[in-house]
Amino acid sequence: MSQPSKHAFTAGEPPRERIAIYPGTFDPVTMGHLDIARRALHLCDRLVIAVGDNRNKKPLFTLQERLELIRRSLAELDLNSRIQVASYRGLTVKFAEQIGATLIIRGLRAVTDFEWEFQLALINRQQNPNIETVCLMTSQEYSFLSANMVRELAMLGGKLDEVVTPVVAEALRAKFVKGGQTADVRDI
């Protein structure tokens, strides 16, 4: 017989706050990310956007810049009442444990994302069976969108107003415009 989840509701006890994390690099945060965060609020009482500090990646924005861009984007969209932003290093599932989260939120753009997300969900379940992974399908208008694509658009001087918030667009332009000219692709 399986043991009940340590987060399970027990008769006579008030229900515990349901905390979810939405992990990622968010380099930069896009309208697709923010759409997933907004929709994830239907599944939890509090959402923590968990910005990974992965030393193996070379992000365009520093960890502090990414945290600030997310906070400012949430404020611009009036989404910050039940969403917090935090950074972490190490296993996502361990961070979820530390903050009492019972859900890990992931976004799926296409079937090509599914295999990787499925493997991550199984590894996370093996590490802690009390934490579930929930995948949300990306809204149709953002199904093509990725942070890599946004960085490339910015580097090439493309329109950013429909893919990121104004604060992120401004930060991207500041990173890529050098002396009035767009940065060279080798600068990335």
Enumerate the predicted regions with their spans.
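Nucleotidyltransferase catalytic core that binds NTPs
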Residues: 2-188
